[in-house]
Swiss-Prot record:
Residues 62-106 are annotated as: Disordered. PROSITE patterns: DEATH_DOMAIN. The gene is TMDD1. GO terms for cellular component: membrane. The chain crosses the membrane at residues 219-239. This is Transmembrane and death domain protein 1. It comes from the Eukaryota. One of its GO terms (biological process) is signal transduction.
Amino acid sequence: MAARTLASALVLTLWVWALAPAGAVDAMGPHAAVRLAELLTPEECGHFRSLLEAPEPDVEAELSRLSEDRLARPEPLNTTSGSPSRRRRREAAEDPAGRVAGPGEVSDGCREALAAWLAPQAASLSWDRLARALRRSGRPDVARELGKNLHQQATLQLRKFGQRFLPRPGAAARVPFAPAPRPRRAAVPAPDWDALQLIVERLPQPLYERSPMGWAGPLALGLLTGFVGALGTGALVVLLTLWITGGDGDRASPGSPGPLATVQGWWETKLLLPKERRAPPGAWAADGPDSPSPHSALALSCKMGAQSWGSGALDGL
């Protein structure tokens, strides 16, 4: 029950702290306000204070100004020279007499006045407004540094707030008696690799079981195959050569031309019988009176020659 009450109080405190507006005093104290005033130039100092003294902008009015109806209507041009921020800086730099003050006077007066005004007003200024004023004044680097300080201080406050709910070291609950740990087995010592010796053992090789006749068969087969192959190749080459060249030269091939024939004229007589079948002149007498004589054979051949000449002449006509 007590733990639930403490947890509820912690949640309620954090919720109230989160809903409360974060002030500038959370990020800087009186000394930080003086340092902030010293970091700003005279122009930035006057602009920064004018932005902080200005009333908080109305969100509803800003939204209505950015509405579609207002954007559709053209706004009248501002004929005044310079922006309001520049005009405010120029007015702040001038004294009531109307003359422009020197850099030293403006710097000292503005910084002192800003530091004196910011110290009591820091509690009522929100962090968003202070950071927005620094960015509009042209010093976003100072805004980032103040944001880091704010985050660090908030973290420290949260840690300090939570320390109250943590149990004290002396009032810690007693830890139940733990049983004695079992004795562990003796650890196996790590081997010393440097003290070990490398031993290489070679297994016995098996006996050579092949006989000399194991290579004689392949060798004889190779020689026989080579001889037969060479002989067959040579015979094939010889046959192809003879077939291409037309034989051994004694006779002509079927496609080659034969020997030149002698041409006989029309006045030459052509023998009817070949030389081998002609008989000598004495053989005609021995045959008897009925056998044809050589003169009758000559006359017959002349007659046939004349007929062949006549037929040749007719063919010529």
